[in-house]
Amino acid sequence: MDLYKELKLTPVRSDPNVWISRLVIFERHSPDPVIIRDIALTRGLNIVWAEETEDDDPTAEISGHSAGKTTFCRLVRYVLGEKTFGTKGNMELIRQALPEGSVAADIHVAGKKWAVRRPFGSGRMSYIKQDATVDELLQQQGGAVSQNDYPKKLGLEALLDEMETGALQRSPELTRPCS
């Protein structure tokens, strides 16, 4: 018996509830933006890896281990509303290296597109703009938002509340008893 042939699946939605299409790390955003990394992401699975070199020399370029994969994941969590972007030690190192630095992203939340920018060092206000890209947010500034209001303004808080209360839609195929 082929169980998959029996399932009659209909999509509940065309897009994920939350996804990031672009993440940009800035050394500074004004007067002239200096981009350190500009990372395009796609819906679905994005694999983050760093190739290891054959060179065991401690002065060789960083690769594989200590290449920033965990920091990247922490920055993703930060643009999604987490209050920190690393351990205390790592945040201090980043703030020292990038006192005017920030991370920005194009985020999609419950069908709405947002451009966001969050600081590493100077200033604790984040900036958001609906129906905009990171580039447009930099040009037009967007609205300043405190850390406490950030998830609520983007709709992330309501989405998390729905997840906690079980208000998210379940497809009938997943609730059907197995025979």
What are these regions (language model features)?
Residues 1-114, 118, 126-128:
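Extreme N-terminal "head/tail" segments of very large remodeling/mechanoenzyme assemblies
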